[in-house]
A protein has these predicted regions:
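Gram-negative/organellar outer-membrane beta-barrel architecture
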Residues: 1-115, 119-124, 193-194, 198-205, ...
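Extended beta-strand-rich architecture
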Residues: 5-9, 25, 54, 101-263, ...
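Outer-membrane beta-barrel domain signature
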Residues: 33, 40, 66-73, 77-79, ...
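Outer-membrane beta-barrel proteins
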Residues: 33-42, 130-140, 278
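Conserved active-site loop/cleft motifs that coordinate metal ions or position small ligands
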Residues: 233-236, 270-275
Length: 295
């Protein structure tokens, strides 16, 4: 859960009043993880500047530079030093990490109607790199790719299917020097519903200390039916996890199921879901709320 967060963002046109803009962001976040996995706190300061260029071809490009510094604090009353993964076992209860990443991203959405689509697809790709010594604790590269598709069919277009897939890979000179919040985690509204945000991923030893992963694979499949004008009932399943490709840590693929209501409102699609995780113990039914197109 996020306990405290503050962020300031400013945007202004650059070389075109509508299709080219600069955006700057600075912020602070305090996050406490206490989800039957570990008691852990992360204090993060971050800043970024990005140039967003919208092209007539539909491909939107983003050039970015972002910095984040994480201070990690472990509850010393819950863990002994010997029970913690490196580097926490060398730095007692506090550890500071940082990274400066230069990035490039492209994305494209094709649909019959951007506000109220009945068919379409989106695709997105990004790459961020950082160099050790240049305000980064290690050499690293983060690659992401994802896509979403929607198709409506049947009499009066009452039936609809939606699929989503998101993949990621993190290369680093030393994974333990990658800032904690820059690693891959899964769970939450836009990941695997039925689980808390970022509560899934590789864990360390018998203490189940959540360390994050260097790979990500998350997917979703949904079927919905229009039972009255502008209203649809949906059933769905989400699946995947953040993974450790070295084999040092174990974690299973997480699966959840759920149902929900979709309302095509004047301001866009409103989605209300309830979901429950099927993998792991003590999974409560969770409520998820969204406004906007699923593409």
């Amino acid at each position: 859960k996020v306990d405290q967060a503050v962020e300031f963002t400013a945007s202004l046109p650059y070389k075109h009043p509508l299709n080219d803009k600069l955006t700057g962001t600075v912020g602070y976040q305090h996050k406490e993880v206490d989800d039957l996995v570990n008691t852990f706190e992360a204090d993060t300061v971050y800043a970024s500047i990005a140039r967003n260029i919208y092209h007539d071809s539909g491909w939107n490009r983003t050039y970015s530079l972002r910095y984040r510094g994480d201070k990690l604090t472990v509850d010393p009353e819950k863990y002994s030093t010997d029970s913690l993964p490196y580097p926490f076992n060398n730095y007692a209860s506090d550890y500071t990490q940082q990274a400066l990443l230069a990035g490039y991203a492209i994305n494209k959405t094709v649909a019959d109607n951007m506000l109220t689509p009945t068919w379409g697809y989106s695709q997105r790709y990004s790459l961020e790199v950082g160099a050790k010594g240049a305000l980064s604790d290690t050499n690293m590269a983060i690659l992401r790719a994802g896509g979403t598709g929607m198709y409506t069919f049947g009499k009066d277009n009452k039936q609809q299917v939606i699929g989503r897939l998101d993949l990621g890979y993190l290369y680093s000179g030393d994974f333990y020097d990658v800032p904690y919040r820059s690693r891959f985690f899964a769970g939450g509204d836009s990941s695997i519903r039925g689980y808390n945000t970022d509560s899934l991923g590789p864990t360390y030893g018998g203490e189940n200390f959540l360390v994050g992963g260097d790979a990500l694979a998350v997917g979703s499949a949904e079927y919905n039916y229009e039972f009255r004008p502008s209203f649809r009932g949906a059933v769905f399943t989400d699946f995947g996890n953040a993974y450790d490709t070295t084999g040092e840590y174990d974690n299973a693929t997480a699966v959840s199921i759920g149902t929900g209501i979709r309302w095509q409102s004047p301001i866009g699609l409103v989605r209300l879901d309830v979901a429950k995780g099927l993998t792991g113990d003590n999974n409560d039914v969770r409520l998820h709320f969204f406004i906007g197109s699923p593409l």
